[in-house]
């Protein structure tokens, strides 16, 4: 029996409709909350979920899958868990946790998820980047060779940092770790103002982990007053935020910094501080019933920090020659650098700047212990003139500390020992610097050159700061610019005469 044209047409229509019935059909995998509390939700039914995938709870709160077990999935909640109840639906998003990145982020304050919290509206043009990505491989990297100037005499002369380096700031609470980090951000202002191309500009990302809101507010005010917020991004996971957000914040900040690194630009990222991130991760791990190890930290706490800090790198010329410099901060308890987290991070980084309470109270600020501080790769990036000027100063300081310990017994000292003590006292005085007053590198070179060459030896210690202020204001700008290259014999004569003449006025 043949179908009429009308019936055949209808049959074809039905067949095509049935064939395309599932074409635009969206299937969501959903699960149900079994238990919830302390920022952790156990969810049943998400069998296909990936590790690190973002999920959405019924009340709109987001979470991330961390524990994949036989029956349940352990999910950390990015927000308050009070509105989540047993039996609530949980939906997979199918995407790994990502955050916004790009130049639109500059000048903004965001939370660990990249959501603006500064009350200045939504973000404009930006791209999304995953918070967890693999660090650049060996062939994609280049050795550190460009200086990253902090504006601090003690750092730029004795523990220099290069673009792409990881330099740890370690010390007890209230020793000036955050101040060094902020000074470094402020110093980029004058470097960026002189930059002639994008490849010279340095962008900054500051990640505040577990700090008080008032402290973060003061930091924002300091950066705004110095017009430093225009090239900076602030990521804040304060003490009142849940542990999962404090754990996530450094990775979010790193993803924002990687945007600049991967596009041939330079960025500096400060993690303040990673001790609090480790504590937040310990809290999450124990609540997820992971077995505790040393100091109750989970076994993978080393990997927590190593996978983060390995993402700071200097890229090769073939991959854009960008860089990401990391300054992680670690807080020690009573100066114990041999604790678990400090030793972990020391072994990951390319050097450390050690700050001590005793030096801080003695008025040596920044309170850097030059003997314990080291920069493993920074000397390759140090300016030639600075290297020439301060080459012997570290050795002289070490000799001074050794001799000063014996000199306090009051025995008679010969002329050579007395000269060493005089020089050492001045070399200890010169690196002192007030808070939020970074010094351009060429002015630093002149000040240190004067101290190393003995122009301050007969000067009272309390006049050294006056001498320092008098130097830069009277030096020809051409000479300051020339000092950036290196000190030839011809160039040395002009500063020598000038510095001696200034010193004689203050003796």
Swiss-Prot record:
F-type ATPases have 2 components, CF(1) - the catalytic core - and CF(0) - the membrane proton channel. CF(1) has five subunits: alpha(3), beta(3), gamma(1), delta(1), epsilon(1). CF(0) has three main subunits: a, b and c. PANTHER family: ATP SYNTHASE SUBUNIT ALPHA, MITOCHONDRIAL. SUPFAM superfamilies: C-terminal domain of alpha and beta subunits of F1 ATP synthase, N-terminal domain of alpha and beta subunits of F1 ATP synthase, P-loop containing nucleoside triphosphate hydrolases. It is found in: Mitochondrion; Mitochondrion inner membrane. One of its GO terms (cellular component) is proton-transporting ATP synthase complex. Belongs to the ATPase alpha/beta chains family. This is ATP synthase subunit alpha, mitochondrial. Signal peptide: none annotated. It holds the Pfam family ATP-synt_ab. The keyword Ion transport applies. ATP binds at residues 171-178. InterPro entries: ATP_synth_asu-like_sf (IPR023366), ATP_synth_asu_C (IPR000793), ATP_synth_asu_C_sf (IPR038376), ATP_synth_F1_a_nt-bd_dom (IPR033732), ATP_synth_F1_asu (IPR005294), ATPase_a/bsu_AS (IPR020003), ATPase_F1/V1/A1_a/bsu_N (IPR004100), ATPase_F1/V1/A1_a/bsu_N_sf (IPR036121). Keywords: ATP synthesis, ATP-binding, CF(1), Hydrogen ion transport, Ion transport, Membrane, Mitochondrion, Mitochondrion inner membrane, Nucleotide-binding, Transport. PROSITE patterns: ATPASE_ALPHA_BETA. Mitochondrial membrane ATP synthase (F(1)F(0) ATP synthase or Complex V) produces ATP from ADP in the presence of a proton gradient across the membrane which is generated by electron transport complexes of the respiratory chain. F-type ATPases consist of two structural domains, F(1) - containing the extramembraneous catalytic core, and F(0) - containing the membrane proton channel, linked together by a central stalk and a peripheral stalk. During catalysis, ATP synthesis in the catalytic domain of F(1) is coupled via a rotary mechanism of the central stalk subunits to proton translocation.
């Amino acid at each position: 029996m043949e179908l009429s044209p009308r019936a055949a047409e209808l049959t074809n229509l039905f067949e095509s409709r049935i064939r395309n019935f599932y074409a635009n059909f969206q299937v969501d995998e959903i699960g149900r909350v079994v238990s919830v509390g302390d920022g952790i939700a156990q969810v049943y039914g998400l069998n296909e979920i990936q590790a690190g995938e973002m999920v959405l709870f019924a009340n709109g709160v987001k979470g991330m899958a961390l524990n994949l077990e036989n029956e349940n999935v352990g999910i950390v909640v990015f927000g308050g868990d009070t509105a989540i109840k047993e039996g609530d639906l949980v939906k997979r998003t199918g995407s790994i946790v990502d955050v916004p990145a790009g130049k639109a982020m500059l000048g903004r304050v965001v939370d660990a998820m990249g959501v603006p919290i500064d009350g200045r509206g939504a973000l404009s043009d930006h791209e999304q980047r995953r918070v967890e990505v693999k660090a650049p491989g060996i062939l994609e990297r280049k050795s550190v060779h460009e200086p990253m100037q902090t504006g601090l005499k003690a750092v730029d002369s004795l523990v220099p940092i290069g673009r792409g380096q990881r330099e740890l700031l370690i010390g007890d609470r209230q020793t000036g770790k955050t101040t060094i980090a902020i000074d470094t951000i402020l110093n980029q202002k004058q470097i960026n103002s002189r930059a002639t191309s994008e490849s010279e500009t340095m962008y900054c990302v500051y990640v505040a982990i577990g700090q008080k809101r008032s402290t973060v507010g003061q930091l924002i005010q300091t950066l705004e007053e110095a017009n430093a917020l225009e090239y900076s991004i602030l990521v804040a996971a304060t003490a009142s935020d849940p542990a999962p957000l404090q754990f996530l914040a450094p990775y979010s900040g790193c993803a924002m910094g990687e945007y600049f690194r991967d596009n041939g630009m330079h960025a500096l990222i400060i993690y303040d501080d990673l001790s609090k991130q480790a504590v937040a991760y310990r809290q999450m791990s124990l609540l997820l019933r992971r077995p505790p190890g040393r100091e109750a930290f989970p076994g993978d706490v080393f990997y927590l920090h190593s996978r983060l800090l390995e993402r700071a790198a200097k890229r090769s010329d073939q991959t854009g020659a960008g860089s990401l410099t990391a300054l992680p901060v670690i807080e020690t308890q009573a100066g114990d650098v041999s604790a678990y987290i400090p030793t972990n991070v020391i072994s990951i980084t390319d050097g450390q700047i050690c700050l001590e309470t005793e030096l801080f109270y003695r008025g040596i600020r920044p309170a850097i212990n030059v003997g314990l501080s080291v920069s493993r790769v920074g000397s390759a990036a140090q300016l030639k003139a600075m290297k020439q000027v301060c080459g012997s100063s570290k050795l002289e300081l070490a000799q001074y500390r050794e001799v000063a310990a014996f000199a306090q017994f009051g025995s008679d000292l010969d002329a050579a020992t007395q000269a060493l003590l005089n020089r050492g006292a001045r070399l200890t005085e010169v690196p002192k610097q007030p808070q939020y007053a970074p010094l351009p590198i060429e002015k630093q070179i002149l000040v240190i050159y004067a101290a190393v060459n003995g122009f301050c030896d007969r000067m009272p210690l309390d006049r050294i700061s006056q001498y320092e202020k008098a130097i830069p204001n009277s030096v020809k700008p051409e000479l300051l610019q020339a000092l950036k290259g290196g000190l030839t014999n011809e160039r040395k004569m002009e500063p020598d005469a000038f510095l001696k003449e200034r010193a004689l006025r203050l003796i």
